[in-house]
């Protein structure tokens, strides 16, 4: 049995200092029934907690660390930038370099604005869509999480799903009434919403792959249908690629599925592990953002040199060949997890998109939030705790996916499959 004495003591102290002892709810490990692990360091595919335990990491800071922990090039870039100054409140050339890379690789982006988080990106994109169209309502999908902005924290997934809260208290009714929610992967519901409110729907915002109800890819024709419906009704299509951006493919989710939105939100990978976000799209739309246009958005640390340098060094290391290797590794892990579950008669359903993998403990195919909620949460919690004992660090929620990095080796994946085999053999009915 692993020892967690230092993590337990640190969490006891933290609960007097921060709400619930953490700075983001899912980190409290509530849904898996254990004390959170306090991490001390990471290198490559491994993390080490303050008690000295080593884990193969599939959290990767919730997705940003596509090259694993403490990537040499990212670390050197950060050292170099920090020595010259961390922020100036003035433009820097590194902003241009990262912006060029993003514009080159993301099909929908002709102009991009850097911000400090994915939440900032989605909130700003919604304001832009409303300002550009002159309409008020937005359409989102049940279980899709787009950050904690009031307009979007309605029937969201992620930590909200884990805590069993459909919404958050504190969201005014006046805000909520302008957010239409329909089931993910249900194109007919989208069409019906446009029949009812089409003249006032500014945009549809969607994750190309839903990542906060677990990993739920789009059904064939779903994204194409959204593109068609929005174009027919004069609404904008926004892809929230904070999670999928540069993770599922070299050209992001929109390149992977061949559907180009009007606006795209980015985060996570483009910051290389530092706080970052971005939104961009067609030049005609983006030129409405201040100071080019009247739609205001600003940020003290937006485009700061540290985040830009980390993001640039992260993206330049990604090539089309990187994603071929991601596909191979992810297929290997998916097949191994499936084989272990089948061997022990564990009800399960595995979804995957590129290097994102979700395993649900249910017999039901998971294509939307209702199906995801059919998962056996008690079994997941027990499985999670056993995987920790086996030295594998997974996201502590059934409603989050696993992430792979370029640092994960075949040996890491084989060890993870072996750990899952042991865990499932102990937990089978």
UniProtKB/Swiss-Prot annotation:
**UniProt xrefs under Pfam families:** Aminotran_3
User: What pathway annotation does it carry?
Assistant: Porphyrin-containing compound metabolism; protoporphyrin-IX biosynthesis; 5-aminolevulinate from L-glutamyl-tRNA(Glu): step 2/2
Instruction: Please list the GO terms describing molecular function.
Output: glutamate-1-semialdehyde 2,1-aminomutase activity; pyridoxal phosphate binding; transaminase activity
What does the UniProt keyword field contain? Cytoplasm, Isomerase, Porphyrin biosynthesis, Pyridoxal phosphate
What SUPFAM superfamilies is this protein classified in? PLP-dependent transferases
N6-(pyridoxal phosphate)lysine sites (modified residues): 268
Which top-level enzyme class is recorded in the Swiss-Prot or TrEMBL entry? Answer: isomerase
Keyword presence, Isomerase: yes
Query: Alphabetically, which GO biological process terms does the record hold?
Result: protoporphyrinogen IX biosynthetic process
Return the GO cellular component terms, semicolon-separated: cytoplasm
Q: Where in the cell is it found?
A: Cytoplasm
What this protein catalyses is: (S)-4-amino-5-oxopentanoate = 5-aminolevulinate
Give yes or no: UniProt keyword Isomerase.
Answer: yes
The record's section on InterPro entries has:
4pyrrol_synth_GluAld_NH2Trfase, Aminotrans_3, Aminotrans_3_PPA_site, PyrdxlP-dep_Trfase, PyrdxlP-dep_Trfase_major, PyrdxlP-dep_Trfase_small
Q: Which HAMAP family match?
A: HemL_aminotrans_3 (MF_00375)
Q: What is this protein called?
A: Glutamate-1-semialdehyde 2,1-aminomutase 2
- The gene name reads hemL2
């Amino acid at each position: 049995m692993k020892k967690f004495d230092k993590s337990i003591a640190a969490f006891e102290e933290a609960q007097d200092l921060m709400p619930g002892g953490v700075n983001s709810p899912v980190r409290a490990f509530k849904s898996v029934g254990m004390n959170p692990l306090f991490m001390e360091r990471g290198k490559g595919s491994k993390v080490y907690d303050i008690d000295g335990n080593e884990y193969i990491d599939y959290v990767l800071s919730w997705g940003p660390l596509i090259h694993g922990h403490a990537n040499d090039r990212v670390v050197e870039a950060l050292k170099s930038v920090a020595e010259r100054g961390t922020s100036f409140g003035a433009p820097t050339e590194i902003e241009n370099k990262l912006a060029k890379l993003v514009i080159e690789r993301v099909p929908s982006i002709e102009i991009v604005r850097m911000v400090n988080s994915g939440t900032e990106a989605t909130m700003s994109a919604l304001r832009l869509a409303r300002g550009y169209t002159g309409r008020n309502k937005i359409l989102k999908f049940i279980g899709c999480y787009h950050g904690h902005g009031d307009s979007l924290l309605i029937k969201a997934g992620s930590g909200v799903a884990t805590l069993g809260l459909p919404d958050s208290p504190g969201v005014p009714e006046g805000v909520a009434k302008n957010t239409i929610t329909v089931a993910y992967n249900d194109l007919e519901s989208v069409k019906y919403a446009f029949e009812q409110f089409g003249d006032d729907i500014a945009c549809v915002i969607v994750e190309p792959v839903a990542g906060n109800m677990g990993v739920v890819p789009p059904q064939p024709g779903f994204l194409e249908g959204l593109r068609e419906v929005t174009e027919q009704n004069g609404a904008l299509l926004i892809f929230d690629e904070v999670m999928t951006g540069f993770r599922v493919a070299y050209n992001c989710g929109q390149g992977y599925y061949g559907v180009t939105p009007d606006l795209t939100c980015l985060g996570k990978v483009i910051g290389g592990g530092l706080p970052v976000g971005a939104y961009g799209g067609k030049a005609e739309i983006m030129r409405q953002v201040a100071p080019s246009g009247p739609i205001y958005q600003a940020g003290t640390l937006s485009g700061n040199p540290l985040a830009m340098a980390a993001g640039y060094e992260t993206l330049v290391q990604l090539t089309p060949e990187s994603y071929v290797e991601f596909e191979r590794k992810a297929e290997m892990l998916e097949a191994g997890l499936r084989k272990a579950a089948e061997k022990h008669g564990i009800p399960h359903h595995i979804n995957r998109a590129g290097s994102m993998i979700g395993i649900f403990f249910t017999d039901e195919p998971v294509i939307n939030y209702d199906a995801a909620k059919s998962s056996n949460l008690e079994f997941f919690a027990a499985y999670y705790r056993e995987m920790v004992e086996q030295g594998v660090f997974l996201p502590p929620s059934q409603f989050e996916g696993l992430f792979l990095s370029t640092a994960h080796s075949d040996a890491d994946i084989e060890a993870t499959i072996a750990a899952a085999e042991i865990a499932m053999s102990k937990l089978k009915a």
